[in-house]
Amino acid sequence: MAFLNMETGELTFTDGFRLSAGLAMGELADALGGAMDGVVRLGGHTAGGGVLIPVCAVQGSALQSVTLSISSVGNRPMRKAERQREFLFARLNVQDPFPDTLIPVHITCPFGEMHISTDPYTGRTEARIIYTAQ
């Protein structure tokens, strides 16, 4: 099973946790404390041999975007920019068009869009998945 469904934008983590457009229940609702809007940083969830930390933006009780940060891969903290970027692109099942230059990538998808960027100073690589209103 793929981590990211490219048609719907649903994220399915190895540990069974799921995030999808419009979702505002379970762990998200509990973390928001009943609020209709806000930003929620969830704990790490496994994905393909690593741990990703999702930060979710909720508006009008629906999931609007998810930012994925890498916590570790194979029980080792991820420090090198190229390794982080390679891991994240592999999880998202997307070809990195600029693996040597670390240029930010914008991808338009049926569910919305993805922005994948690497900070050249810290090496931190993140993916922001933005869902289009249905």
Model-found features: residue ranges?
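Short helix/turn-capping signatures at newly exposed starts of structured segments
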Residues: 1-103, 114, 118-134
